[in-house]
Amino acid sequence: MPGPSPGLRALLGFWVALGLGILRLSAVAQEPFWADLQPRVALVERGGSLWLNCSTNCPRPERGGLETSLRRNGPEGLRWRARQLVDIREPETQPVCFFRCAATLQARGLIRTFQRPDRVELVPLPPWQPVGENFTLSCRVPGAGPRGSLTLTLLRGAQELIRRSFAGEPARARGAVLTATVLARREDHGANFSCRAELDLRPQGLALFENSSAPRQLWTYALPLDSPRLLAPRVLEVDSQSLVSCTLDGLFPASEAGVHLALGDKRLNPEVTLEGDAIVATATATAEEEGIKQLVCAVTLGGERRESRENVTVYSFPAPLLTLSEPSAPEGKLVTVTCTAGARALVTLEGVPAAAPGQPAQLQFNASESDDGRSFFCDATLELDGETLSKNGSAELRVLYAPRLDDADCPRSWTWPEGPEQTLRCEARGNPTPAVHCARSDGGAVLALGLLGPVTRALAGTYRCTAANVQGEAVKDVTLTVEYAPALDSVGCPERVTWLEGTEASLSCVAHGVPPPSVSCVRFRQADVIEGLLLVAREHAGTYRCEAINARALAKNVAVTVEYGPSFEERSCPSNWTWVEGSEQLFSCEVEGKPQPSVQCVGSEGASEGLLLPLAPLNPSPSDPSVPRDLAPGIYVCNATNPLGSAVKTVVVSAESPPQMDDSTCPSDQTWLEGAEAAGPACARGRPSPRVRCSREGAPRPARPRVSREDAGTYLCVATNAHGSDSRTVTVGVEYRPVVAELAASPSGGVRPGGNFTLTCRAEAWPPAQISWRAPPGAPNIGLSSNNSTLSVPGAMGSHGGEYECEATNAHGHARRITVRVAGPWLWIAVGGAVGGAVLLAAGAGLAFYVQSTACKKGEYNVQEAESSGEAVCLNGAGGGAGSGAEGGPEAEDSAESPAGGEVFAIQLTSA
């Protein structure tokens, strides 16, 4: 083998150097010398190799080595030896590491081998194993070991039968055998048995090695000790066939059983069927020679055999021979009948046996008509093996005689119904069979005897029938009668009869038929027969059933009509009728009269004058004209006419309709004016007038005499009358005239010359109001916001003093004369109108004091308070003390142009 690799040599050198160093240290310490072997204990797979390191701490040993019986090689040093043991096969070996250092130093090791369970053998099973008997399972695992680490398991399929561990066996022991005795069962049939071996070396740091044997299949069987049941005849006739059967119960598996059936030296071909654990074989047995033969049945299973045997006697027994002296004999001729059979058979002719077995039997007689077609029978019996066998023969005699026409075969009188096909038969007795011919005595029609054909009245009459053969002829007269049903035609019995009310009439029908019929008529669904003259009244009109009765009875329906003039009945044509719009209902006016009168109703006055009233048809159909949408109410005159007269009736027609709510009566979007009279959000058409209820969010609208802004919203309105209801969703909007809700001045105190001030006017109105301003003439630099609600003045001057009028306008009115007066630095006046100079001078001192002392800080104006007060109002809405002086000036006269008294506000302009 090759030496150690360079890497291994380096490793060994390192260990040697390390060991020498340790030895030096030991020598210095004067420790005892020793020898060491690594590894001391090892487990190696059989045939493998192992490196051993033998070393000592002796500084200079005289000699050393590794003693073992195994092949080895490897490097060495002064104080160490490295050896590779190869092809280790012995179960156990003990190598010795030794060195000579004044004394002999030794170290012993232990090397053991293991072998995997590569071969697991299950001893072959018997080809068939009887159920209920024991068989042996034996498993061998040669060479595997150590045995103490082995475990063997015997298995049936995946089921463990027995498991054995060999723990505690000697370490050198190898291989193992496990044997078990098992009782064979039916369910073991076809089962696979196997052996599993486990070598567990995990405690030694190795793995678990497993292997299993090839499975061996077991075939079990059960065969009863009883013999098969054989069913077969005791005797069998030559060249005849007979069924034989063989049955055996208690087989397992029955499908594996074999059956052998044979008669003598001839093997039969059985048909085998299985019935649970029973096998049944049936076959057809036949033999060609007389004698005693053995019938054998054998059943084999699992190498065992059960059989049964029976003796069968094969015989020959011909049928008896029956002869007639003349098979066809003339009437009155002597006839001899003879019956013969085999030598051992006893014959019997017509119940009379022969004198002895093997003797013939005879019968003689004179042939007569009654013997024609007579059959003669002969029986032959044979006693064989305790059984009585019998056979018979027969012969028929034909007797020749002249024709005979009997009433049974050819009646003198025939009666047939007309119409259905019949087969006309007139048969004669005779041998040979006679030919029969039937024709009228006057040489007319000939009957087609024996053929299927229709029966007509023309066939009725008397015929002469002749039957003839070689023995003679016979003649007979026959009469044919053809019956037919009564005929009720339109001449003798018309289908429709018309009588006039008040006259005399009778209902009679004449019918023809064979045999002659009788005729009677009754009213439909009544029992009384109509006879004699009748005084015609309307109640006689209707349908009558006339019956003509003979053997082929016939019935016919006759409709009798009684005519009379028109007449109106209140129940079928009412005097008062109400038409409901949309009901698709027409006026029904049914008039009594025959023929059916025509009816027409025409308006006589008012809106319906000259108009035709549509009438409901008597027999409605899809093609009838459509129902009119509008029908004029009023008085109509109905006239009914037929050929016998006319009748007149007056009908009052009124029209009603279900509720209807649409944009014409109840717009879905409505606009109301605040303060107007409240009429409700909805109305509806209909007759009678519908009742309308409206609710908003489920609550009914409160009753208010005048429209309020709170009435705005969406309503569900339902209109109802006797003919139905209608609903509609209505959205209500409320509009109102402008009201100035806010007037504000900023700043709220005085304005110095050159300062800025702003006037704001806000109005409430729907639709929204348009705002406009009127400023003092010549006031410069006035600015307005986009919607005119704010007026601003930058750099106020004396020219900005005066009236500023805010006007709010929409379609329902306007609010105006909201006035602000800007006073100059020396004049402090705030009054409701443009008063004269004298009045202003007189009131100046008091007003200046009012302006200076009033808390006008908020800069807001409450229009509603101002409209209800005659006082001058401050910008924050507080009342002033101008009193009546403001009401009596010229400005008060101008107030007639506006809906409310003008309000005046003062903004003080002070010097800079």
UniProtKB/Swiss-Prot annotation:
Cytoplasmic side: 848-912
Descriptive protein name: Intercellular adhesion molecule 5
Residues carrying sugar: 53, 134, 192, 211, 311, 366, 392, 576, 639, 756, 787-788
Source organism superkingdom: Eukaryota
Biological source species: Oryctolagus cuniculus
Keyword vocabulary terms for this entry: Cell adhesion, Disulfide bond, Glycoprotein, Immunoglobulin domain, Membrane, Phosphoprotein, Repeat, Signal, Transmembrane, Transmembrane helix
SMART domains: IG, IGc2
PANTHER family: INTERCELLULAR ADHESION MOLECULE (PTHR13771), INTERCELLULAR ADHESION MOLECULE 5 (PTHR13771:SF9)
GO biological process: cell-cell adhesion
Role according to the record: ICAM proteins are ligands for the leukocyte adhesion protein LFA-1 (integrin alpha-L/beta-2).
Modification Phosphothreonine occurs at: 179, 181
Signal sequence extent: 1-29
Bilayer-crossing regions: 827-847
Processing and modification events after translation: Glycosylation at Asn-53 is critical for functional folding.
Domain (Ig-like C2-type) ranges: 47-127, 132-232, 239-324, 332-395, 403-481, 486-561, 566-645, 659-734, 738-819
Extracellular compartment segments: 30-826
